[in-house]
Design a protein with these regions (language model features):
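Short, surface-exposed, charged amphipathic helix/loop patches that serve as local interaction elements
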Residues: 13-97
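Short acidic-hydrophobic surface loop/beta-edge motif
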Residues: 1-10
Length: 97
């Protein structure tokens, strides 16, 4: 499976049903406070758990795959992987569809 992120193409592993559902649950929990409290509050621990899980699924050796990237670039790559795995489409304004 191939995605585009950080101005290049990345070859990533596919994702099966069970890990996809777990990733969805963790990713959803990161935004639950914002939805429930009608705020901009994000559970950053859950958000980074989702990023780490996505990177671990996407790459056989995540540390090697992201070598040389900044933390911000790693987060952007992880978010692109999550969007690909969970079929999240971007709106024209940059938010999720």
């Amino acid at each position: 499976m191939e995605i585009e992120a950080l101005g290049k193409k990345w070859e990533i592993n596919g994702i099966d049903f069970k890990p996809r559902r777990k990733l969805h649950a963790i990713h959803s929990q990161s935004y639950a406070p914002a939805v429930l409290n009608k705020s901009n509050e994000i559970d950053w621990d859950k958000y980074y758990d989702a990023i780490e899980m996505a990177l671990s699924i996407a790459f056989t050796n995540p540390e090697s795959a992201v070598e040389g990237l900044t933390d911000a670039e790693i987060d952007a790559l992880g978010q692109a992987i999550i969007q690909s795995y969970l079929f999240i489409e971007k709106k024209a304004n940059g938010g999720a569809a």
